[in-house]
Every structure is written in C-alpha cells, then in structure tokens.
Amino acid sequence: RDQPRSRGLGDVYKRQAFSIGLFMLLPTFLSSFVALATDSVLVRNLVDAVLRIAIFMTYMIAVSRMKDIRRVFSYHGAEHKTIFCYEKGLELTVENVRVQPKHHPRCGTSFMLVVIIVAILVNTVVFALFPVENVFLRILVQLALLPLVVGITYEFNRYVGGHDNPVTNFLAKPGLWMQNFTTFEPDDSMIEVAITALKLVIPEEKGKDAWGK
C-alpha cells in the first residue's frame, strides 16, 4: 500500500538531484577549467554565474517548446489566473478567471531563478573570503550553503509576493519575465480544473491563507 507513495517520493528526490546537478554543480565543474587560465576569483565566479543563468534559460526555453509540456504549462497559466481571481476576492468562475494575468510573483519559476541568483551572490562572497581551488571541495561547500540560499530565496519571495509597491514590483520583474517560457494561455476546461483544485484547499477560516504578512 505504501509502494506508490514511496515511488512518488523517489521521483521527487530524483528531480531535485537532477536540478541541483544541472543548475548548480555542472556550472561549477565547467567553470573550474577557467582556473587553468587565470587566478582571478572574480573571473571564475563571473564565468560560473554566466553558465548557471545560461544553462537555466536554455533548459527552460527548450522544455517550453515540447508539445506535451506546453499543455502542462497551459495548466500552469490556469493555476496562476485562478489564484489571482481568488486573491482579488472575485467569484471563482471561468469568466472571472479567464481575464486574470497568467504571470504570478510567487511562481515556482520565479523561485528557481531567484535561487540561482542568490546562490551566485552567496558563493561569490564566500569564495572571495575563503578561496577554494579544489572543484570537488567547492561543490561540497555549495551543497552545504544550499539551505541558506533556499532560505534567503523563500524570505525574498515571501516579501515580494506580500507587498505591492514600485520596489517589490521591480524586484519581481526578472521572475515574471521568465514565466513567459513556463506559463501559456489556458482553455476553459483547464480553468475549470484549476478552479476545482483551488476550492479543495481554500481554508474555512478567513485569514488562514494570508501571505507575506
């Protein structure tokens, strides 16, 4: 009876390992070859940063061109529209949801992008203060710093998602732009699915769904 759940958790761990390997460890390994040409920590960190962002964007753009994934990303757009409708206090109907924006500041895509940016900043500071030449040791240090990076990212997204002002709107722009590749316009049937899913998790007590307060 526990087999499907165990299999599901295994898939989650595999995806997490893949993401860490592709977006964090691979750039570190590739940038290690820069050390053969220069002793500059700044140059090495800059190359690492460029590789991280380039790999992330290339992956997202490539995935978004896959037919089946585009359908998934349309459901993603329906989710965002439905949440916007709910947060505005409107009745959850297809008509009300359809006209809402498909980009949301608290999207997982934005979270992933901010994780990469925060990791770049944290790693730059740490390796500038405590230079590490061995590539495998650098990878271990980055893995050790990952909880800090994720924690900072969570608090950043929590603050940006919970406030509406020129500063937070500006900070949210990179993540919102990235959602051009991970959210597409849904059809009405997708919106109906999103509405049904949201209604199942709406708390009975008012205020229990407050975000960023």
Residue ranges and their predicted role:
Residues L46-I53, T58-F111, Y159-K213:
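Polar-ligand-bearing catalytic/cofactor-coordination segments
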Residues Q16-S40, V115-V141, V150, Y154:
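Juxtamembrane "helix exit" motif at the C-terminal ends of alpha-helical transmembrane segments
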Residues L140, L146, R158-H163:
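Accessory, usually C-terminal, subdomains that scaffold auxiliary metal cofactors
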Residues D2-Y13:
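Single conserved hydrophobic/aromatic residue that forms the stacking wall/gate
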Residues F18, L22, L26, A54, ...:
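Hydrophobic alpha-helical membrane-associated segments
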